[in-house]
């Protein structure tokens, strides 16, 4: 974030730290913080603010940390409900898996996938599946005064859920302020079941909080069946995309090294 490098632990390591150039050519620790569950989604409020989110697999509430990049200290922690659809059996309850934290102006956009609140008899979370893969979802919150619940949730059925597990760029911002989302929907990227909708890109215009009904980039049509696996903004209204050339492997296999079917 800005000129600050953040590091965070995972699993049993619940500590984070901020580092920066001390002005004498050396990297120096500026501060640190702790968290309860692993931080698995990140974004920037601005050049001086890190957003980091705890995403417990068996809890519906998401814990958002707002961290000062200049001190490395937590300024605010908010418990938010991105999406919850209760069920009589708690294991059938649908909750959110966020795939980006994107601030634009006075809004925080959080694209998400719907997953089941599944856990085993010992209370441990199990591998989750995408329960509604044929639609894109974004929760829109106020910012920086973040409420417990989103102002609204927008959706689009022209493509699949936005983003993939482990990536933080489900939404990117162009120079003119327009936001672009990427949808994958591939089994090899962790979707279960696979989406029947084409992998593609949607747009939310600057100063708008709805998907642009006049814009849709069909990635599968443009790449002879390829699916977006990542999308990173490169400046000048251009982005670098990583494409899965096919989706013939097993679940999560795109993250491994046994099959290589990716191209830029």
Predicted features, each with a name:
Residues 18, 62-72, 123-147, 194-209, ...:
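Beta-propeller blade signature
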């Amino acid at each position: 974030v800005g000129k600050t490098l953040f590091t965070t632990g995972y699993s049993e390591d619940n500590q984070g730290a901020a580092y920066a150039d001390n002005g004498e050519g050396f990297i120096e620790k500026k501060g640190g913080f702790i968290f309860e569950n692993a931080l698995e989604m990140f974004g920037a409020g601005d050049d001086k603010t890190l957003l980091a989110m705890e995403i417990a697999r068996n809890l519906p509430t998401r814990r958002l940390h707002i961290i000062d990049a200049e001190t490395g200290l937590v300024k605010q922690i908010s418990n938010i409900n991105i999406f919850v659809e209760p069920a009589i059996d708690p294991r059938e309850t649908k909750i959110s898996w966020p795939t980006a934290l994107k601030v634009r102006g006075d809004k925080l956009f959080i694209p998400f996938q719907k997953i089941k609140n599944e856990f085993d008899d010992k209370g441990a979370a199990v591998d989750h599946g995408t329960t509604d893969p044929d639609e894109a979802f974004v929760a829109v919150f106020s910012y920086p005064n973040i409420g417990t619940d989103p102002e609204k949730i927008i959706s689009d059925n022209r493509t699949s859920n936005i983003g993939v597990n482990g990536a933080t760029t489900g939404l990117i911002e162009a120079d003119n302020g327009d936001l672009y989302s990427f949808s994958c929907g591939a089994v090899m990227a962790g979707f279960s079941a696979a989406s029947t909708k084409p992998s593609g890109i949607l747009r939310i215009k600057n100063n708008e909080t709805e998907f642009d009904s006049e814009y849709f980039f069909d990635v599968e049509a443009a790449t002879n069946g390829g699916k977006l696996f990542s999308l990173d903004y490169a400046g000048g209204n251009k982005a670098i995309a990583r494409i899965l050339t096919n989706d013939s492997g097993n679940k999560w296999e795109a993250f491994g090294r046994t099959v290589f079917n990716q191209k830029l």
